[in-house]
Structure formats: structure tokens, C-alpha cells
């Protein structure tokens, strides 16, 4: 795996940062972006690249992709992480908050797909993993914007995977449950059959596998990493 290039968005902290650290530890050259500025420091600390750019800003995404290509000449993989959209009473969420969620969760992936797919095609392949949520397919009123738009992300990932499979390009989603990147709540923990929050490194290692050659026959999938919290089979 050493020497391959991965771009991880919205990775200044939390799950995205954990994924970036794991990939660097496995020998990837890592480019990190975040809107907060933390991504610049993290990227440098991992011996890679760091950019300050929001994944909701098309020009910022273009700058991140161009900067990575300028430095390393290729991009082999992308991890699309994102922040947490507005929560609230279902019908009280404003149009503006729905539109912000759309930009953050779905359009950010679509825009980055447009930028990196031609790169993947020139290189003979590539892979993308999108960080979604366990509630994408079992909606939870606690996360209405996230549920609705990440369900759409599941459909998009399947459409993209089918369209570009012949070009040796893969896309998958990971659907995390409750992880220790956020403060633990007893009520949430009690919902989990394994009886605990997930550890960020557990998610990160799964993402690393999906990006690897060992997962070369996996595409268009929505993989639950949730300690068993979802009930459907």
C-alpha cells in the first residue's frame, strides 16, 4: 500500500481525522482537508498535505484536488467525511438548514466525484468511501436531515458504482453507529447490542480495508459498523 495517495475531506477532527491517521500508519500518502484549519496541521503531522477548505465550497474542493495532484501527481482514493447537519423537530427545520445539509452530505460527494473520476480513469482505477450513518436506512427522528440525505447518498453510491465499475472505480459507504469521537451518552449505549460505543480506530481500519486491493470485489455497498444497533437484515 505504501506510496498510494488518498484524500480525506472534513478530517480536522473526529472520525475523519482518525481515518487519516490510520491510513498514514498503513503507508498511504495522505492529503487532509477541513474547514476549521485543523486539517492543515494534521496533514503536516502525518507527513502529508493539509488544506483549509470546506467540502461545501466547490472552489475549495477544486483547490484541494489540484494541490494534491500538483504535489504527488495522482490520487488513488478519496474518503468523503462530513460534519453533522442541523438536528431538530422535523417540520421546524428551515429550508436553509435542509439546503445546507444537502450541500454538506450529498452535493459534496457529487462534486468531488466529478473532480476525481477523470483522474481515476486516467490512472486505470480508483476507489472512494463515503462516511454515512447507521440511521440512513432505519430513520431516527433525532437526526432527520442526516437520515434523509444520507439515504440519498446510499442511492448515489450504488448508481456511481454501477456506472464506473468497468473503469475499475469503486465506491462504498460506511454507516457508523455511536462512536467515541463524541461524548458518550448512556441512553445511546444501551441501544447497542455490543453494549459500548465504537472506537474510532475500528471504523478507520474498516475504511482502510475498503480502500485496499483486498476489497477489490466490493462496490456499491452500504456497510454498517454500528455494534448491531440496526435491526434489519
Residue ranges and their predicted role:
Residues 138, 219-233:
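Short C-terminal tail/terminal secondary-structure segment
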Amino acid at each position: 500500500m505504501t506510496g498510494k495517495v488518498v484524500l480525506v475531506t472534513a478530517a480536522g477532527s473526529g472520525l475523519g481525522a482518525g481515518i487519516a491517521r490510520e491510513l498514514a500508519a498503513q503507508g498511504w500518502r495522505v492529503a487532509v482537508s477541513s474547514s476549521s484549519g485543523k486539517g492543515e496541521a494534521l496533514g503536516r503531522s502525518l507527513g502529508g498535505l493539509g488544506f483549509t477548505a470546506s467540502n461545501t465550497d466547490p472552489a475549495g474542493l477544486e483547490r484541494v484536488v489540484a494541490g494534491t495532484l500538483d504535489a504527488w501527481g495522482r490520487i488513488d482514493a478519496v474518503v468523503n467525511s462530513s460534519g453533522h447537519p442541523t438536528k431538530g423537530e422535523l417540520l421546524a427545520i428551515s429550508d436553509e438548514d435542509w439546503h445546507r445539509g444537502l450541500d454538506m452530505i450529498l452535493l459534496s460527494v457529487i462534486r468531488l466525484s466529478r473532480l476525481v473520476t477523470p483522474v481515476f480513469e486516467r490512472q486505470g482505477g480508483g476507489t472512494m468511501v463515503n462516511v454515512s450513518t447507521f440511521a440512513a436506512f432505519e430513520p431516527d427522528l433525532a437526526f432527520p436531515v442526516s437520515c434523509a440525505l444520507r439515504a440519498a447518498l446510499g442511492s448515489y453510491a450504488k448508481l456511481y458504482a454501477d456506472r464506473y465499475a468497468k473503469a475499475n472505480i469503486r465506491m462504498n459507504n460506511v454507516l457508523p453507529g455511536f462512536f467515541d469521537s463524541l461524548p458518550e451518552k448512556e441512553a445511546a449505549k444501551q441501544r447497542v447490542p455490543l453494549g459500548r460505543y465504537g472506537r474510532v480506530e475500528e471504523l478507520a481500519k474498516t475504511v482502510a480495508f475498503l480502500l485496499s486491493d483486498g476489497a477489490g470485489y466490493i462496490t456499491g455497498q452500504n456497510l454498517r459498523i454500528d455494534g448491531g444497533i440496526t435491526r434489519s437484515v
